[in-house]
């Protein structure tokens, strides 16, 4: 029989409607019959008791806010009746928990590209990256011309990645731009890269070249458009040379321990923390047990669930780094006069998410139960395997770009409302509900909605692992098929 509601944690005093519920309908929870006093949309919460004003609403076993007014049992409770408990900066105490994933190691491989420096990519693409937005038009024309000329034969894609920055920036913004562009250029999914500059920008070509550090000079080339006659002719000449080298690369068997994935959610709904996000958590734990790596970001969407992550930090030093990660972002909000709890979007609320704690406790399901083994600043590159936390905002474009930039081969993106967006690595969309998967097959790659339709999570995860391996081995996801590929760089300061 189809389940019509779900109590996520035994301590919860609300349940989530799995399908639309009608006024007068009776549900039985923990042996108690409750008659609904109003219609409740799927994904939204039903009260299991009478709430006094100020009493905490418990979901996922934790408070997600408090009742603004008294609320009766059997009512639909949403953002109009729940207020966040979040405030400003907090002092945290390290209360470490013991983690034992108890997941057997399997001899799994995927077909990847082994680079000269020993790193592995899951795509072999030719990228054109501008140091400044002034040359965006040029790089677009170059990419289109090379695609027409070669039909991408022998490579996975030929892509230009325009952005608006590289000039009129100071301080952290200028450094952030340089870091993200550097990280892209060094990313193993690129078989060859042409860096196109104007010549007079803040992000000076010679300085940026030094900023890159060690790179493969056979596969990374520069063109300064102010220093050449016909930039299109010169650009095509360089690109033909790069393309000829990239297309000689071949896939080989690579252990799954080399795979690095980013964990992302966007357009979340009331099913996110029940289906797709726990699925990612189960996969993340599996991957880490195989020696692989997963990365969680969207720091503002950790607010309200941060202590869960802090207590999973393997060391006191990592705990302290996580405290800084959280409080630095809170200070960023407060310095702009913004409350730290004003996060859920209109789409989130329509889908059943009422407060930031509600969103955060669902969001952090994506990283499973593993120890936290690394904490990174924005623009940093991965140094350790296992579960890493990355500083970046919740914005889909900025966060996904940051995940790819730190070295993730692909971004696993759960969504309940749907989005076509993809960043510069494969951006796999996992739907939280089957309706979205059916309505948006051009966007959605994998449907986790079956988890509330009587398919066991373990079986869904087995299928998901198989699909991940196919994608890592070259099967394109929808954002690649449709060429929905963009980058966005975090900006916090002034524009000159």
Question: What residues fall within each predicted segment?
Answer:
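Metallocofactor- and cofactor-centric catalytic cores in central/energy metabolism, strongly enriched
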Residues: 1-410, 417-420, 425-496
């Amino acid at each position: 029989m189809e389940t019509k509601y779900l109590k996520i944690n035994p301590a919860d005093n609300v349940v989530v409607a799995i399908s639309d519920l009608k006024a007068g309908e009776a549900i039985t929870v923990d042996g108690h019959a409750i008659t609904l006093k109003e219609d409740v949309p799927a994904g939204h919460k039903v009260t299991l008791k009478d709430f006094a004003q100020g009493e905490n609403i418990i979901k996922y076993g934790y408070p997600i806010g408090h009742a603004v007014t008294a609320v009766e049992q059997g009512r639909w409770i949403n953002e109009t009746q729940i207020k966040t408990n979040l405030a400003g900066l907090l002092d945290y105490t390290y209360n470490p928990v013991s983690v034992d994933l108890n997941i057997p190691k399997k001899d799994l491989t995927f077909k990847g590209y082994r680079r000269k420096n020993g790193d592995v990519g899951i795509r072999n693409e030719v990228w054109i990256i501008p140091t400044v937005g002034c040359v965006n038009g040029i790089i677009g024309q170059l990419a289109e011309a090379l695609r027409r000329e070669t039909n991408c034969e022998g490579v996975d894609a030929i892509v230009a990645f325009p952005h608006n920055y590289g000039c009129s920036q100071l301080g952290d913004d200028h450094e952030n731009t340089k870091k993200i562009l550097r990280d892209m250029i060094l990313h193993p999914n690129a078989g060859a890269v042409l860096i196109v500059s104007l010549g007079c920008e803040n992000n000076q070509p010679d300085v940026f070249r030094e900023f890159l550090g060690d790179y493969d000079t056979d596969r990374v080339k520069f063109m300064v458009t102010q220093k050449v006659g016909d930039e299109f002719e010169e650009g095509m000449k360089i690109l033909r040379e790069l393309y000829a080298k990239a297309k000689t690369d071949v896939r080989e068997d690579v252990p799954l321990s080399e795979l690095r994935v980013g964990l992302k959610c966007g357009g979340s709904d009331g099913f996110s923390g029940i289906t797709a996000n726990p699925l990612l958590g189960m996969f993340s734990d599996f991957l880490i047990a195989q020696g692989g790596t997963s990365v969680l970001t969207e720091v503002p969407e950790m607010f309200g669930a941060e202590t869960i992550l802090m207590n999973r930090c393997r060391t006191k030093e990592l705990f302290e780094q996580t405290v800084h990660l959280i409080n630095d972002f809170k200070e960023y909000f407060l310095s702009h006069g913004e409350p730290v709890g004003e996060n859920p979007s209109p789409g989130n609320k329509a889908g059943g998410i009422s407060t930031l704690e509600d969103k955060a406790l669902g969001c952090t399901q994506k990283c499973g139960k593993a120890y936290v083994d690394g904490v990174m600043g924005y623009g940093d590159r991965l140094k350790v395997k296992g579960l890493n936390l990355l500083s970046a905002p919740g914005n889909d474009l900025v966060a996904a770009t940051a995940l790819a930039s730190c070295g993730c081969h692909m971004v696993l993106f759960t969504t309940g409302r749907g989005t076509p967006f993809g960043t510069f690595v494969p951006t796999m969309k996992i739907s939280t509900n089957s309706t979205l998967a059916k309505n948006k097959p051009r966007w959605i790659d994998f449907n986790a909605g079956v988890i509330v339709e009587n398919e066991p999570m373990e079986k869904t995860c087995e299928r998901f692992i198989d699909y991940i391996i196919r994608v890592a081995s070259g099967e394109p996801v929808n954002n690649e098929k449709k060429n929905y590929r963009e980058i966005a760089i975090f900006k916090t300061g002034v524009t000159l």
